[in-house]
Design a protein with these regions (language model features):
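The feature marks the mature, well-folded catalytic cores of soluble enzymes
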Residues: 2-279, 285-359
Length: 359
């Protein structure tokens, strides 16, 4: 939110129930901080294959620092540094990026890497893989490319019923950012259709996605309206919006920022009573703060926390090694970016702070 932008408080909201956990997950934290390190370590431009995370404000913040987002690695000039997004990339994309000769950082979420590994192992053992995922979503596209001849993407029960009669064993895997509701019915239909289906010992569904959905379900029945903060191309954000509607909340609004809240003709926020607020896993906390300021609840804000999240994903190894080398050179008086600090600070500094420091 720009400092010069003033959001008119409403005075008509009684109170806000603020879901927790909300906002950045561990994978998004890692990816944003990794790209921040690259911006600080390299002379621009730094390139990024796809949006680093699915959030308009985050992408705009990096674009302001000269990061160039591309949807084809062929658009990256040879020798330029490039980051691959948190959603995971097809093996041929990783190979092409590497062959272009620049420094390549793969910021894929470790939970997505787990699914890629499962696909590779099951395909190698001769399984047909039923993969529950959204058509065209970058995570699904990258995962399916790991073993395109073995994997069959489905999104609903009808697509499960339309699958062929496999002669080989069947495995069931999923896009990590699905809602449990999206996954459960399709998984049940797959198990009914293929009773001997193999499933991983630990669910493919992201714990952060599940936590945010559970936190929303804790507050939604008590709310007159729910505001979900996040971008329309964020799968987990859209799932939160749909979940709030399924919970029976009549007024559900997905907004990129406070400026998009519904307004009365006089410009005031057109919400009343108790308003629930949550944010998708790619939405920075500054957007939440701006929405709370705009709602200005007379009875204050009550944070409803269902669990704590302390998971930490460190930067990719080659980036850690680069930053360590820069630190050592700087300590010897041999140059290097003065703003770069030791990687031991990475865990302590939240992505929102790292992102804000770029401004």
């Amino acid at each position: 939110m720009n400092d010069e932008t003033t959001i008119e408080p409403t005075g008509s909201v009684d109170r806000v129930l603020l879901a927790a956990p909300r906002g950045f997950c561990a994978g998004v934290e890692m990816a944003i901080k990794a790209l921040t390190w690259m911006v600080r370590a390299f002379d621009g431009p730094v390139y990024c294959y796809h949006e680093i995370v699915h959030n308009q404000r985050v992408v705009e913040r990096f674009e302001a620092q000269g990061v160039v987002f591309v949807d084809d690695v062929a658009d990256v000039p040879p020798g330029r540094p490039v980051m691959l997004s948190a959603h995971g990339s097809a093996p041929e994309v990783v190979l092409e990026a590497t062959e272009r000769g620049g420094f390549v950082v793969d910021a894929v979420c470790p939970l997505v890497t787990k699914v890629h590994h499962e696909v590779k192992v099951r395909a190698g053992k001769g399984y047909s893989i039923v993969y529950i995922g959204h058509d065209g979503h970058e995570e699904a596209v990258g995962t399916m490319a790991v073993a395109p001849d073995a994997i069959h993407r489905v999104e609903d029960v009808a697509e499960v019923e339309a699958l062929p009669e496999f002669t080989e064993p069947v495995a069931l895997l999923a896009q990590t950012t699905l809602s449990h509701r999206d996954w459960a019915d399709v998984a049940a239909a797959t198990t009914e259709r293929f009773p001997d289906v193999w499933t991983p010992g630990r669910s493919d569904l992201c714990f952060a996605t599940t936590n945010r959905q559970a936190a929303l379900m804790e507050i939604a029945p008590r709310c007159d309206a729910v505001v979900v903060i996040g971008s329309s191309n964020s799968s987990n954000t859209v799932a939160l919006e749909r979940l709030a509607r399924d919970a029976g909340c009549d007024q559900v609004f997905r907004v990129n920022a406070a400026e998009e809240l519904p307004r009365d003709v006089d410009g005031r926020v057109a919400l009343r009573g108790t308003v629930g607020v949550t944010a998708g896993a790619s939405a920075p906390e500054e957007l939440v703060d701006a929405v709370l300021d705009a709602l200005a609840p007379a009875g204050g804000v009550e944070e409803v926390r269902i669990t704590d999240e302390d998971e930490y994903f460190p930067p990719p190894r080659n980036l850690r090694d680069l930053i360590t080398a820069i630190d050592r050179l700087a300590s010897l008086g041999l140059g290097g970016p003065g703003s770069a600090s030791t990687t031991t600070t990475d865990r302590a500094v939240p992505a929102s702070s790292a992102l804000g420091a770029l401004s």
